């Protein structure tokens, strides 16, 4: 699963994000086969190819969740080998996430609770366990799911008018998927507000653990292998999940212990871990450890070619919000970004983005002005960096969330991306 610069709505808050990204593409070659001799051409007419199956209809949210869950549980090909008669299958739920950003929200959290209750009440073959390192180490079944905004063509581009619910049940022992569930839901009744950890997180970057989770759930079928990016990191992910749960409850000291423990694991170098260490230290008033943790956040983003850092702007302005509770860490963030970027000797194209509300010419202008403002602030913190940056604005043409709410749920639509370019 980009931080963002952007215009805000009635709430009077705008968010900016900084991103570094690098795209590599390739293509396959085609080879023409020799023509079939006329005498060997078959005289029978080939059978018509089977048309692709139509996607499921868009349903009311509650009905869509029930439809996807029922398909998942009823069609599960449960392993029989090594299981005693009448035995229950232990299942853990790795918290469901947004399929574009990787964030957990009020909606995904509620869906996870509903799935757990369904298994307990209607499917006695399952024994729901907590998603903890101790339980994951026993190689149970694991349930994952993504909840992704889509447009009228069922694609993740432009204004989103529905949600795609994708569920998967996997067996950690065999390393394969046992079942899938898919449904499309109307947005009515959906609360996409991010949980506190994801709302407070200062930055976003692509994370292999999250990428593996999404790839395991999306574009797969029963019998397919679990994506290795996810399988290799699930033990550390369970510790991260416990840290997020502690953070949500305001137990910041406990959360810090979980994040620190996760970082020490072989697969613990995850972006959520670095964000968590920063957040917990900041909440505990530990300013120096928080600054050091944010430097690690920046290092991770630069290493993975993409970093998004959140800044809240005044509506229609390039000035930060005047609320000290929100903007107090910004000078330190800017200093760290400038220092790490300056030392990397890379050249950047800084591109501003906005939400789709308002006239697009105004959105494009505002996105450019905010990109230029961040460019100027970074240059003030690192001599020589000015000549290695250019600014650009694209308005709302490249939204990631696209729900047009202009609140915390679509914060990543209001971003400034930093793309590595040739010097």
Question: What are these model-predicted stretches?
Answer:
Residues 27-86, 172-261:
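C-terminal/domain-edge helix-coil "capping" segments
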Residues 61-80, 84-125, 164, 199-200:
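An acidic helix/loop motif centered on a single conserved Asp/Glu
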Residues 72, 76, 90-96, 121, ...:
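A short, hydrophobic beta-strand-centered structural micro-motif
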Residues 48-63, 302-336, 355-361:
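Short, solvent-exposed beta-strand/turn patches at coil↔beta or beta↔helix junctions
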Residues 102-115, 288, 321-327, 353-423:
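Periplasmic OmpA-like peptidoglycan-binding domain that tethers envelope proteins to the cell wall
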Residues 86-102, 307-317, 334-371, 389-402:
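Short, surface-exposed beta-strand segments enriched in small/polar/acidic residues
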Residues 64-84, 318-351, 376-380, 418-423:
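Periplasmic peptidoglycan-binding/anchoring modules of Gram-negative envelope and division proteins
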């Amino acid at each position: 699963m980009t931080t963002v610069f952007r215009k805000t709505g009635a709430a009077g808050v705008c968010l900016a994000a900084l991103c570094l990204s690098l795209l590599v593409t390739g293509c396959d070659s085609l080879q023409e086969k020799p023509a079939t001799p006329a005498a060997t051409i078959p005289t029978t007419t080939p059978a018509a190819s089977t048309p692709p199956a139509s996607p499921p209809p868009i349903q009311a949210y509650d009905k869509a969740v029930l439809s996807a869950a029922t398909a998942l549980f009823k069609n599960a090909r449960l392993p029989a080998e090594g299981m005693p008669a009448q035995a229950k299958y232990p299942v853990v739920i790795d918290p469901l996430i947004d399929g574009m950003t990787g964030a957990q929200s009020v909606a995904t959290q509620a869906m996870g609770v509903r799935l757990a209750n369904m298994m307990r009440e209607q499917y006695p073959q399952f024994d729901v366990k907590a998603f903890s390192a101790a339980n994951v180490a026993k190689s149970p079944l694991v349930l994952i799911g993504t909840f992704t905004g889509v447009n009228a063509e069922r694609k993740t581009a432009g204004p989103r008018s529905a949600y795609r619910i994708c569920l998967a049940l996997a067996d950690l022992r065999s390393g394969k998927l046992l079942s899938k569930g898919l449904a499309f839901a109307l947005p009515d009744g959906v609360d996409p507000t991010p949980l506190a950890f994801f709302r407070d997180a200062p930055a976003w970057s692509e994370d292999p653990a999250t990428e593996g989770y999404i790839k395991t759930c999306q574009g797969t079928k029963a019998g397919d292998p679990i994506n290795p990016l996810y399988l290799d990191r699930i033990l550390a992910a369970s510790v991260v999940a416990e840290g997020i749960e502690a953070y949500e409850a305001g137990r910041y000291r406990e959360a810090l212990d979980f994040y620190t423990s996760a970082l020490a694991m072989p697969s613990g170098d995850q972006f959520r871990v670095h964000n968590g260490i920063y957040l917990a230290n900041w909440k505990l008033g530990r300013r120096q450890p928080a600054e050091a943790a944010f430097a690690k956040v920046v290092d991770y983003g630069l290493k993975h070619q993409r970093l998004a850092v959140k800044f809240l702007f005044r509506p229609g302005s390039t000035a930060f919000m005047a609320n000290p509770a929100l903007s107090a860490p910004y000078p330190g963030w800017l200093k760290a970004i400038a220092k790490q970027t300056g030392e990397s000797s890379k050249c950047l194209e800084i591109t501003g983005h906005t939400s789709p509300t308002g006239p697009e010419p105004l959105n494009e202008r505002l996105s450019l002005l905010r990109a230029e403002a961040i460019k100027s602030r970074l240059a003030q913190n690192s001599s020589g960096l000015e000549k290695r940056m250019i600014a650009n604005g694209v308005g709302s043409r490249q939204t990631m969330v696209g729900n047009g709410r202009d609140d915390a749920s679509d914060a990543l639509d209001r971003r400034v991306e930093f793309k590595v370019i040739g010097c």
